[in-house]
């Protein structure tokens, strides 16, 4: 009995052990594919694991739920091959330079090369001609490079940074070259003039102004020079001279940047856009600085011009302003002001009684004096005042 019972127990225990082994083998077979890593394809990395990142040098990368770009979750922006250029999340490129361990931001640019050129300009101004640049450094042997070096030497670091941020550096550089060339006659012209027995005067830097086509004038309103910081362009002129491609959905237009040159050769950069809310074309960014520097007030006239086709400036835009001041007594010329009435005096008991009325500004704080001046003739009022002063003596 004992031996048979032991055999039964061994048989039962052996069967249960076999079942357990089979169950463990099946479980291992099911979980084995999930534990495989690097089987000739891309590795599967848990995105929720902190610090997990695929190798940038691997052939590919699989992210759960779809493909990821360079700026995707857990990814890094591509570095630039240029010095002083940093990528932006929106696909644009930024430029920066360090001055005394402080970062100086030079602006954001559409292309990587444009940002690299902006850095080179700042490096030439901040660190001199020996600065390390991305492209070929400026040299005195090249006339264009020498002109740019001269331009940088006459501008402060803050001015150069401001021009780079507003994307007006190359426009102002071109204007500086034209002005310098106009004020300095060439050697050939000087030699030819001397051979003819006379020296011709250099061409005025503002001579191309005669080759401009007048577009339109705008009389600024109080809101144009107020706190709204915008200039409304009349719709008929805006659609004719500055057409914009408006969004089909009727939304707000981001607009474009327009460069205008004033009479002094300074380049002004304005953002020109369409406001769907007010259905108007406006100049916004940069306009408040123009108003402040030019001293514009309501009633002044701003003129817009474009270079003529024969000038060869490819439709260059110009801006001018005419200040219209009040013709009141405070600003009137001395010839327009009436001559003061002669002062008459009457001598009574050894005292000179003046007949000239008191100035109005002296009576501004006295209501009785103002009422007296309004109801009493000037001579009678002056005589009465003198009599009162005499009685009080």
UniProtKB/Swiss-Prot annotation:
Write one Gene Ontology MF term: DNA binding
User: Where is this chain primarily localised?
Assistant: nucleus
Renumbered to this chain, the Gly residues biased-composition regions fall at: 57-75
Region: Disordered, residue numbers: 49-79
Question: Where does the record say this protein resides?
Answer: Nucleus
Q: Which cysteines are joined by disulfide bonds?
A: none
Task: State the UniProt keywords alphabetically.
Answer: DNA-binding, Nucleus, Transcription, Transcription regulation
Domain of life per record: Eukaryota
Pfam family of the protein (one) = AP2
This one is known as AP2/ERF and B3 domain-containing protein Os01g0693400
In which organism is this protein found? Oryza sativa subsp. japonica
């Amino acid at each position: 009995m004992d031996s048979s019972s032991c055999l039964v127990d061994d048989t039962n225990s052996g069967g249960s052990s076999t079942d357990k082994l089979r169950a463990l083998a099946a479980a291992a077979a099911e979980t084995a594919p999930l534990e495989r890593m690097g089987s000739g394809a891309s590795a599967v990395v848990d995105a929720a694991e902190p610090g997990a990142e695929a190798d940038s040098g691997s052939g590919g990368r699989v992210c759960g739920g779809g493909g990821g770009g360079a700026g995707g979750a857990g990814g890094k922006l591509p570095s630039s091959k240029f010095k002083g250029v940093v990528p932006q999340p929106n696909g644009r490129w930024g430029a920066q330079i360090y001055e005394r361990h402080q970062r100086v931001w030079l602006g954001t640019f559409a292309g990587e090369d444009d940002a690299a050129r902006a850095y080179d300009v700042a490096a030439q101004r901040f660190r001199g001609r020996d600065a390390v640049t991305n492209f070929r450094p400026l040299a005195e042997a090249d006339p264009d490079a020498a002109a740019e070096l001269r331009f940088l030497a006459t501008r402060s670091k803050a001015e150069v940074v401001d021009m780079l941020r507003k994307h007006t550096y190359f426009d102002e550089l071109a204007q500086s070259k034209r002005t310098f060339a106009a004020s300095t006659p060439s050697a050939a012209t000087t030699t030819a003039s001397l051979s003819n027995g006379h020296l011709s005067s250099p061409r005025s830097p503002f001579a191309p102004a005669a080759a401009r086509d007048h577009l339109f004038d705008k009389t600024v309103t109080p809101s144009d020079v107020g706190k709204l910081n915008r200039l409304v362009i009349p719709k008929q002129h805006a659609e004719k001279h500055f057409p914009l491609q408006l969004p089909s959905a009727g939304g707000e237009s981001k607009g474009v940047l327009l460069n205008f040159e004033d009479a002094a050769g300074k380049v002004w950069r304005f953002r020109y856009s369409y406001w769907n809310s007010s259905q108007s074309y406006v100049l916004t960014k940069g306009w408040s600085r123009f108003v402040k520097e030019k001293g514009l007030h309501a009633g002044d006239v701003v003129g817009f011009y474009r270079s003529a086709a024969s000038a060869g400036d490819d439709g260059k835009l110009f801006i001018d302003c005419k200040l219209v001041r009040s013709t009141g007594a405070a600003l009137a010329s001395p010839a327009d002001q009436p001559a003061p009435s002669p002062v008459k005096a009457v001598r009574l008991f050894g005292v000179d009684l003046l007949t000239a009325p008191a100035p109005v500004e002296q009576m501004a704080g006295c209501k009785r004096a103002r009422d007296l001046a309004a109801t009493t003739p000037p001579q009678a009022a002056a005589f009465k005042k003198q009599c009162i002063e005499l009685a009080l003596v």
